[in-house]
């Protein structure tokens, strides 16, 4: 009880301090809001919104158990739904993983153990961000992005295996398949419109976290002499990777690895928001610390086998990306998302 009261008091105090800082530095807050909104339109929404729609459609139908059985056995999962969710998480990223864990566990389609393993195995950055943005744009080599993406999945597997050695919850529960209730039948209204509506809500939640922590970072930076890399890495993963890549040399590569492992407060907030009762903070924290060491070791081991010289590890200044119009595909997707969001708001107001 005392711990709960202390947490509430700390949260109230932090909210009060943040409110004062926002009033004292409105320009910095506006700058953070603008950068967060631009990030959401340029990369977050194109990367996550389609995967949220696909996940809604796939989880509404029974999974292909026979096709998923090899992956299910390899990962030590009890239900084929969990194996399908892990595969989708590796493509969609941590937000998809948390959303699927919370939904499947909340509807009793997977056990507590499977929900925990889903978060540990599926909590990663998607290939669009790691390969395209981080490897191709920030680090300057697409091969490095592919290596980072594969290495972070391998680090997830290694960290989960280590936790299984010291945790009784890592052992399969034979009674789950017989004891769990039958999965509820999907509602009659389930389909593409409902999937899009749910994906809009999830995407707005993700964008809200990104914009909020961008504002917090901009405001704190205007008052405190905090190193930009430490602040951005602690708050938001994309800003942390951008600041790490700007350092050049080997610090760019291994700094990005550290940011990918520790995630940042924005990602932790999204995971807690979407996973609900399936959220396991202690196990996930230990897993991410182990992930940090495994990923650093794997990159040091594998980067020497890449063909050619390591161009990313140069001391040149960071690439300047000028502000310009969005690409046509990103602009079209952003327009469609805004239309869907406005339609949903109008529908909610009309129903009231």
Stretches with model-predicted labels:
Residues 43-60, 205-218, 252-270, 290, ...:
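Hydrophobic alpha-helical segments involved in membrane association or supramolecular assembly
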Residues 75-139, 231-246, 254-275, 286-289:
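Alpha-helical membrane segments and immediately flanking helix-loop junctions
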Residues 102, 116-123, 127-180, 274-275, ...:
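Alpha-helical transmembrane segments of multi-pass small-molecule/ion transporters
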Residues 98-99, 108-114, 128-129, 157, ...:
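C-terminal transmembrane helix pair
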Residues 38, 42-105:
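Membrane helical hairpin/interfacial module
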Residues 13-28, 33-45, 49-53, 150-226, ...:
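Selected transmembrane alpha-helices and immediately adjacent juxtamembrane segments
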Residues 23-34, 59-64, 132-134, 142, ...:
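Transmembrane helix-loop junctions in multi-pass membrane proteins
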Residues 63, 192, 196-260, 264:
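Transmembrane helical segments that form the transport core of multi-pass membrane transport proteins
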């Amino acid at each position: 009880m005392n711990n709960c009261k202390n947490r509430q008091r700390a949260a109230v105090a932090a909210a009060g301090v943040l409110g004062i800082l926002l009033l004292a530095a409105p320009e910095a807050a506006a700058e953070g809001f603008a950068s967060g909104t631009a990030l959401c339109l340029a990369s977050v929404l194109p990367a996550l919104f389609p995967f949220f729609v696909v996940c809604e459609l796939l989880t509404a139908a029974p999974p292909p158990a026979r096709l998923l059985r090899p992956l299910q056995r390899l990962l030590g999962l009890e239900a084929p739904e969990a194996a399908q969710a892990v595969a989708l998480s590796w493509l969609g990223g941590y937000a998809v993983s948390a959303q699927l864990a919370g939904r499947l566990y909340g509807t009793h389609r997977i056990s507590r153990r499977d929900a925990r393993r889903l978060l540990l195995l599926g909590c990663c950055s998607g290939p669009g961000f790691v390969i395209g943005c981080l490897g191709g744009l920030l680090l300057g080599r697409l091969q490095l992005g592919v290596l980072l993406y594969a290495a972070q999945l391998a680090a997830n597997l290694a960290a989960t295996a280590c936790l299984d050695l010291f945790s009784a919850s890592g052992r399969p529960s034979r009674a789950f398949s017989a004891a769990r209730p039958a999965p509820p039948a999907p509602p009659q209204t389930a389909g593409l419109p409902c999937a899009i509506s749910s994906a809009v809500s999830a995407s707005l939640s993700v964008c809200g976290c990104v914009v909020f922590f961008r504002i917090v970072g901009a405001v704190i930076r205007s008052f405190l002499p905090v190193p930009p890399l430490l602040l951005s890495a602690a708050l938001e993963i994309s800003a942390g990777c951008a600041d790490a890549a700007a350092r050049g040399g080997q610090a760019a590569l291994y700094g990005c690895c550290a940011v990918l492992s520790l995630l940042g407060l924005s990602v932790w907030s999204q995971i807690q928001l979407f996973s609900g009762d399936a959220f396991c903070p202690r196990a996930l924290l230990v897993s991410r610390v182990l992930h940090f060491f495994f990923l650093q070791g794997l990159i040091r081991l594998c980067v020497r086998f890449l063909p050619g010289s390591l161009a990313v590890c140069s001391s040149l200044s960071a690439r300047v990306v000028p502000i310009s119009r969005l690409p046509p595909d990103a602009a079209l997707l952003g327009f469609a998302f805004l239309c869907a969001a406005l339609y949903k708001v109008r529908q909610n107001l009309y129903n009231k």
